[in-house]
Amino acid sequence: MSKIKRRALLKSIGAFSVAAGIPSALHAENLVKPFQLKESFSETDILIVGGGTSGTIAAIQAGRTGARTTLIECGSQLGGCTTTGGVSFPGIFHAWGEQIISGIGWELVLDAVELNGDQLPDFSKIPKSHWKHQVSVNPALYAMLAEEKCLEAGVEIRYYETPTSVKFDNGKWLVESIGKGVKTLISTKQLIDCTGNALITSMAGYKVLREKETQPGSLIYSMGGYDFDQLDLSKIPNRYHRALRQNMLRSKIRKTGENTFVPYGYVYVNGADSTTSETHTIANQKGRQILLELIRELRELPGCENIRITSMKTETAVRETFRIEGLYKITKQDYVSGRVHDDSLSYSFYPVDLHREGKSIYQEFLKPNLVASIPLRALIPKKSENFLVAGRCLSSDRLANSALRVQASCMGMGQAAAVTASISIQEGVTPAKIAPSLVKKRLEEYGAIIPN
């Protein structure tokens, strides 16, 4: 049967089915049972909380080791800032002409680039601006590929859930997670906090740190309906020039892999905090209010009367909340000097990048041929057992953290934490007691690049 005939047949069957079902549907009786919360118990080897930049990679890696792996994500998709937050521009994977972060994170980025028909920057050339070596990805594709890789690795994904209690009992963690109509008690041998806010670390009773003043978040959007080249900028206040220029550039088709602009527009959201549902709600409302006011103001400008929003992310991307107090705290001096520790498991390359209430950015760049590294001890909270973190909440001072928080670095941490957790199970010891050489060897087997 030809495809055309088959489609016609299916269409006719569908139409008949709908028509046949109408009379009974009109006379159907609605029997609605009272709402009941489904309670259950589950066991897993490695439980990862947070399906963002680091958690997604940690879950894929944990699953690929053969460990039973569960991933809790409070949202509807994986990827975190790369997808939901809209920073679809991960980096930095290369430094001084060489690749310094590879493994599963790089694999995922490459797959997203290839499937979207995009091109990579020329990493052999050292750019004048660090962000020119970041990689543009299609966020929708990235989210789908991340989910596919998790499922292929056997990961159980639990969307729309958040933990409500965390207890250590007889060498295992008991995590109560609640979601839409479900409450599950999960027993796990290893627990990895990838929330970005050190939420699980705090719930477990370990110390966390926070600055009195935190960096602003960003609500990412795009707009159209105007021609930047035709605008008379002399009639438009300077404070609007960046937003107008940025979105004009974004609409242009890139013909090479070279980044000539950051591929999104954004507004700063001071005090953005994703730690609780209440603070997260405030951050998102504030971001949308700021953007709405910007659009109203722009439409009053000459040549901008038809400006319109073409897309807006559903969440404000957050830069800074809580950090753990780990067995080792990475300092700014460690970072900018490119210090390598005996237990360094992954690299990090990005300038110290402290955003100050949207008014200025303090940056400090690494000197030629220096690359920072991340020791295992910075991923382990003090006095913890069978517990790791990955992502921006690692143990670090504020200035070091402003560089360590970026996506490629978080991906490397996620993979390192997952491999460490799997070895902990195999060896029957807590992560802090594992020989770093054993973790390094296993990471290399999975394609990661180890600091030396």
Question: In which residue ranges do the predicted regions lie?
Answer:
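N-terminal export signals
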Residues: 2, 8-28
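A short, basic/flexible loop-to-alpha-helix module at the beginning of a structural domain
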Residues: 29-43
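Beta1/beta-strand and adjacent pyrophosphate-binding region of the FAD-binding site
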Residues: 40-52
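N-terminal Rossmann-fold NAD(P) dinucleotide-binding loop
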Residues: 55
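Conserved N-terminal/central alpha/beta ligand/cofactor-binding core
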Residues: 61, 67-68, 74-165
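Flavin (FAD/FMN)-binding glycine-rich loop and adjacent Rossmann-like elements that form
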Residues: 81-82, 143, 160, 179, ...
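Conserved beta-strand-loop-beta-strand element in the redox core of flavoprotein oxidoreductases
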Residues: 167-184
